[in-house]
Amino acid sequence: MIKIYAPASIGNVGVGFDILGAAIIPVNGSLLGDFVTVKLSNKFNLVNKGIFSNKLPKNTEQNIVWKCWLKFCNTIKRNIPVSIILEKNMPIGSGLGSSACSIVATLVAMNEFCDKPLNSKELLLLMGEVEGEISGSIHYDNVAPCYLGGLQLILEDSKIISQTIPNFKNWFWIVAWPGTKVPTAEARDILPKKYKKETCIKNSRYLAGFIHASYSQQPHLAARLMQDFIAEPYRIKLLPNYLYVKEKIKKIGAISSGISGSGPTIFSISDNINTAQKISAWLTENYLQNTTGFVHICFLDSKGVRKIG
């Protein structure tokens, strides 16, 4: 038996649309992500458990786990009869890399179960392919940090897909999911097909500056440059009161904030735990729309996916 945990992640990290992603873990030590358990069986079998298992497709062949299993078997050219348990603890369409959690956990579990026929690069490529089939385009800004941990810069080079970027150890990342859903495909469709040259230059300047500030360990510069000129101006239509919320948490003391992935989860950053707790309390009171929503104060998760059983 193999049991794998894969963490939630923040896609884009504000300034890096489809280029940056960060794995997160609550500061209280709890695990925020999905679990996948693989056992030997005489045929494929899938059991869905967890908080959000009732949101998964009833048809097994529409489940991400089945798609991962099939793609893995086709890749290694072997049919592997297994029983898989998916513990779905991440809300679907939340902007926290929910699909990436299931993809990464399943493919790593299958690879471990089969004595690692695929290397880490081959696995990551496979993860990107499955993510692309679900969302409409291959992107690694959730699967890479979920798999590798930390803050990842997505290069998509044939030899180097992703590189780990230094982060700031004293940053607290507050993530707030309101309890609603924004499908990734819908959030991508709302974006323009073309951008003005000035917008592209400005976004490139801020992204380059953020990477420089990360390597030179200038937290205030990095926080100031975490602005999104590509997706946020259009996706705010999908997030009622987003600009109001962003302004309020800035007044409380957030040094940066933005939309996590496609939303509706938003993230904010503080370099002080007391301020982080105040932001968390305000978001809990004012951003959550139902009882399933949540707010977590997190660190970046440097481990990424891991075997826990």
UniProtKB/Swiss-Prot annotation:
EC identifiers of the protein: 2.7.1.39
Keyword 4Fe-4S among UniProt keywords: no
Binding locations of ATP: 91-101
UniProt xrefs under PROSITE patterns: GHMP_KINASES_ATP (PS00627)
MF-aspect GO terms: ATP binding; homoserine kinase activity
GO biological-process terms attached to the record: threonine biosynthetic process
Pathway: Amino-acid biosynthesis; L-threonine biosynthesis; L-threonine from L-aspartate: step 4/5
Membrane-spanning residues: none
Function: Catalyzes the ATP-dependent phosphorylation of L-homoserine to L-homoserine phosphate.
Family statement: Belongs to the GHMP kinase family. Homoserine kinase subfamily.
HAMAP family given in the database record: Homoser_kinase
The protein's name: Homoserine kinase
Organism of this sequence: Buchnera aphidicola subsp. Acyrthosiphon pisum (strain APS)
Lineage, top ranks: Bacteria, Pseudomonadati, Pseudomonadota, Gammaproteobacteria, Enterobacterales
